[in-house]
Amino acid sequence: MDLVLEVADHYVLDDLYAKVLPASLAANIPVKWQKLLGLNSGFSNSTILQETLNSKNAVKECRRFYGQVPFLFDMSTTSFASLLPRSSILREFLSLWVIVTIFGLLLYLFTASLSYVFVFDKSIFNHPRYLKNQMAMEIKLAVSAIPWMSMLTVPWFVMELNGHSKLYMKIDYENHGVRKLIIEYFTFIFFTDCGVYLAHRWLHWPRVYRALHKPHHKWLVCTPFASHSFHPVDGFLQSISYHIYPLILPLHKVSYLILFTFVNFWTVMIHDGQYLSNNPAVNGTACHTVHHLYFNYNYGQFTTLWDRLGGSYRRPDDSLFDPKLRDAKETWDAQVKEVEHFIKEVEGDDNDRIYENDPNTKKNN
């Protein structure tokens, strides 16, 4: 995340912080608090320091602590002009919270919109368990949750910026560095798939489900906009393994950004209602549809491995992959019958869903 933050600092945030919180404000703050908070009291020799850091003799590689040495861009005088220097944990937290929130919202809305226009099976709107105003409710919950999920996530990024990770930038080509980099993609998927499975299964414990996970299961059949429609603590808990991985295992910094983007794409894809993959090893859209319909199956994120080992795997019905049967009344009636059984089992009488297309059960109390 230091790469993203340095780009933001160079093009926007250095100037913004220098204008909003100039170093001259330090004159009004006791020295004790300046040291405690890591504030910048202003450099009379900032030009000399800037020239030293930008010189050809400076080692231009990512340091253990962000903000000490430039990597992508040369520093300028504004890099030293704010009360909050680049290396300030307060500044790092605030900057990353804004960046992650904006990027998260844009990625969610952009990816889900593309999926809705080009991929999403809109016959789902006719399903008897599609809710009234469902898509608007999905978007509202996701947009309101993403800033809070970002706030919970940012401390992990701050840890990485301050040396508490095994993220790296330099590839050791002489010692099979490229091969190791490729292997990291597979180990990341393997590790995080297990982590999501464990977190997701815990979220289905009755008390935890009612407190945190129930909002996401309001959607019995999904649109792509359901992908990030979580209680913020729920969404954060399911993402923890993505942050634990680089703390304990090596991961290239660019791969880290690619994988985080991929995870968001994948999350949208498994909510798009297009059952393209019937691979028994892949936890695709069909498997996740089974999870939303029947609650107690297919907790994994990418593969079916952990569900098989944990005894929670349920193979999607063949009717999901047959265009003639998928939207047939008989198929939907069978789904509704089983769905109602699981709603009663998991939620009891606490069911406030109002359905769009089922006049007999518009509100199921």
Curated annotation (Swiss-Prot):
Its EC number is 1.14.19.20. The histidine box domains may contain the active site and/or be involved in metal ion binding. It is a multi-pass membrane protein. One of its GO terms (molecular function) is C-5 sterol desaturase activity. The gene is ERG3. Interacts with ERG28. GO terms for biological process: ergosterol biosynthetic process; sterol biosynthetic process. A motif (Histidine box-1) lies at residues 200-204. Present with 36200 molecules/cell in log phase SD medium. The keyword Secreted does not apply. The lineage of its organism: Eukaryota, Fungi, Dikarya, Ascomycota, Saccharomycotina. There is a cross-link at K324, K344 (Glycyl lysine isopeptide (Lys-Gly) (interchain with G-Cter in ubiquitin)). Pfam families: FA_hydroxylase. Pathway: Steroid metabolism; ergosterol biosynthesis; ergosterol from zymosterol: step 3/5. The keyword Oxidoreductase applies. The chain crosses the membrane at residues 93-113, 141-161, 243-263. This is Delta(7)-sterol 5(6)-desaturase ERG3. One of its GO terms (cellular component) is endoplasmic reticulum membrane. Residues 114-140, 264-365 are lumenal. Residues 1-92, 162-242 are cytoplasmic. It catalyses: episterol + 2 Fe(II)-[cytochrome b5] + O2 + 2 H(+) = 5-dehydroepisterol + 2 Fe(III)-[cytochrome b5] + 2 H2O. Keywords: Endoplasmic reticulum, Iron, Isopeptide bond, Lipid biosynthesis, Lipid metabolism, Membrane, Oxidoreductase, Steroid biosynthesis, Steroid metabolism, Sterol biosynthesis, Sterol metabolism, Transmembrane, Transmembrane helix, Ubl conjugation.
